[in-house]
Amino acid sequence: MVFTGLALEFTVVGFLFYSFPVIWPYLISELGMTESQLGMVSAFYFIPVAILAIIIGRALDKYSVKNFMMIGAIIYAVGLFSLSFINSYWSLLTIYLTILALGSIMMGNLAVAKLISNWFDKNAGRALGIAAIGISFSGVVLPLVVDPLLDLVGWRNV
């Protein structure tokens, strides 16, 4: 369970936040976006996430965490795939604020914390700490992986 949590934290935070700035130059040159607009995408993302956290948090107390995480992973994957079709700032913003926000809250920090706290009676804090390593680890690894792939396959395929 701890490794699953680590992998989910790595994926959700890594792709949305640590890989995104690496792609900025391509979005600026190809789609004419500004750095300010791209920065606001990440900032605005937290508005629906904050609202959804209350709703999803309550639902996680009633329903299966595993099912929420699986559905969230599918939604998140659809959101990442959808990014390859963006053609404007507004399409990027829409995907981040809807599909990615919903998918990430269903499989990210909130769900991971619930999953681990349900699994461990003792040492839950340690288990949560180990899972949280995925966040930092993704910040080191993903930019190093994504950057060379951009030149190799293009930003829409990364």
Q: What is the role of each PLM region?
A:
Residues 45-47, 136-137:
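Short hydrophobic/small-residue motifs within alpha-helical transmembrane segments
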Residues 51-90:
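Conserved MFS/SLC helix-loop-helix module at the cytosolic interface between two early adjacent transmembrane helices
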Residues 122, 130-158:
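Helix-loop-helix hairpin linking two adjacent transmembrane segments in secondary transporters
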Residues 96-133:
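Cytoplasmic helix-loop-helix junction between adjacent transmembrane helices
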Residues 90-96:
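Short hydrophobic/alpha-helical segments at membrane-entry points of transmembrane helices
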Residues 1-35, 53-56, 142-143:
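Extracytoplasmic
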Residues 33-42, 128:
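Juxtamembrane helix-start elements in MFS-like secondary transporters
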